[in-house]
């Protein structure tokens, strides 16, 4: 058992005070112990071959407009991976969010994010602290996202500043009474050092085909708007407030396992909430390969879904495009109604991974059909001839 879980095993508090429907989130004092809640929902970590410090999905914003049109808002959110979750959280505005990942390091990664949200006064300061680049001045200005990127890019990493911030981050993490070990704090520092070393050039893997963190921050939705959580002060402040009130809960677990995802569902149910969105990336591809998709699907069907609940997926076709694919993007973002997923599973399930990601995938562009023309969108502003995209 991991040290984090060993230290808390005798102090788990499973009870959560329920809240009324759409009412405002309760004050922090009414929340269970943050560490205890994280532990109670978690299970033993598993293996994944990469660190996933930032996303590799340039298409991650392409579902935002469709979700807004469908009324996907409020309730509870569940996602996997690093900070692309914050963009979905900023758009959906849930009352609570759970980040589940098979990797224990992802929990520690989110403790780094959480502490940085607590320390930072502005978006610029948030990026400065993570990258070890003191570009924020007195912390009182509020530049646009392009200027934030430019300031970080033109400010060299500063060892003294980084060391001071790394120490402060560790102190903040320990102030939550998290029983993290010295070894786990070293993992937090290792992740922090990767942000310092590469700055905005940090990638999912340091090879050219993956986007940099800079590119991910500056990406746009299908309407041409920059909608990353760092793009506007309003988006950043919502996520920051949720983090400061311990409403972004990192969970260690296999989504096909017997405990973590089901426990999250029960925690949502106890609170009187409904699950509005599950961001699963391309995890289901690995589940189908490993023969564990059916246990996962069974758990999904039992979750307390909202009426307009959705499943957000990422598809990596290695050259094969889908109707929702956008020219210039290595990934394709997909959206399925939870009701469609449940109905299909009850009708016999999906025949393959490609069947899963295509059968009930919604068109994402308003006013565009489900045929190949739905995918003819330009990554940035402007247009691209159909012949350049169509297979």
Per-segment meaning from a language model:
Residues 6-17:
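Bacterial N-terminal signal peptides
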Residues 71-85, 97-98:
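Conserved class I S-adenosyl-L-methionine
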Residues 83, 256, 273-290:
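A short SAM/SAH-binding and catalytic strip from SAM-dependent methyltransferases
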Residues 96-249, 345-382, 389:
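Class I S-adenosyl-L-methionine-dependent methyltransferase module
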Residues 228-235, 253-266:
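A Trp-anchored, charged/polar loop motif used as the substrate-binding/catalytic surface
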Residues 260-264, 286-298:
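A short, conserved alpha-helix within the catalytic core of class I
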Residues 291-390:
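C-terminal regions of proteins
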């Amino acid at each position: 058992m991991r040290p984090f879980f060993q230290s808390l095993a005798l102090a788990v508090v499973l009870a959560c005070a329920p809240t009324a429907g759409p009412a405002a989130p309760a004050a922090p004092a009414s929340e269970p112990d943050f560490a205890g809640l994280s532990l109670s929902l978690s299970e033993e970590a598993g293996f994944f071959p990469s660190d996933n410090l930032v996303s590799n999905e340039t298409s991650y914003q392409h579902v935002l407009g469709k979700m807004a049109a469908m009324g996907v808002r409020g309730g509870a959110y569940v996602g996997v991976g690093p900070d692309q979750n914050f963009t979905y959280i900023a758009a959906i505005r849930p009352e609570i969010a759970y980040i589940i990942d098979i990797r224990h390091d992802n929990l520690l990664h989110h403790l780094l994010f959480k502490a940085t949200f607590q320390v930072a006064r502005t978006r610029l300061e948030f990026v400065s602290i993570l990258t070890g680049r003191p570009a924020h001045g007195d912390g009182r200005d509020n530049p646009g996202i392009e200027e934030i990127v430019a300031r970080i890019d033109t400010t060299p990493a500063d060892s003294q500043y980084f060391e001071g911030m790394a120490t402060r981050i560790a102190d903040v993490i320990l102030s939550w009474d998290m029983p993290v070990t010295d070894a786990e704090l070293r993992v937090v520092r290792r992740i922090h050092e990767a942000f310092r070393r590469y700055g905005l050039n940090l990638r999912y893997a340091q090879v050219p085909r993956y986007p940099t963190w800079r590119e991910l921050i500056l990406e746009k939705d299908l309407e041409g708007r920059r909608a990353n959580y760092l793009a506007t002060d309003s988006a950043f402040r919502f996520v920051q407030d949720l983090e400061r009130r311990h409403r972004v809960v990192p969970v260690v677990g296999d989504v096909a396992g017997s405990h973590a995802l089901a426990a999250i569902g029960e925690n949502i149910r106890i609170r009187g909430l409904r699950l509005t969105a599950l961001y699963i990336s391309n995890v289901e591809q690995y589940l189908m390969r490993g023969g564990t998709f059916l246990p996962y699907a069974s758990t999904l069907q039992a979750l307390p879904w909202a009426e307009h609940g959705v499943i957000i997926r990422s598809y990596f076709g290695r050259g094969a495009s889908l109707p929702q694919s956008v020219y210039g993007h290595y990934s394709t973002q997909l959206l399925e109604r939870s009701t469609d997923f449940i109905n299909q599973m009850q009708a016999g399930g999906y025949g393959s991974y490609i069947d899963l990601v295509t059968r009930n995938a919604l068109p994402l562009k308003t006013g565009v059909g489900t045929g190949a023309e739905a995918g003819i969108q330009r990554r940035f502003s402007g247009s691209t001839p159909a012949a350049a995209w169509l297979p």
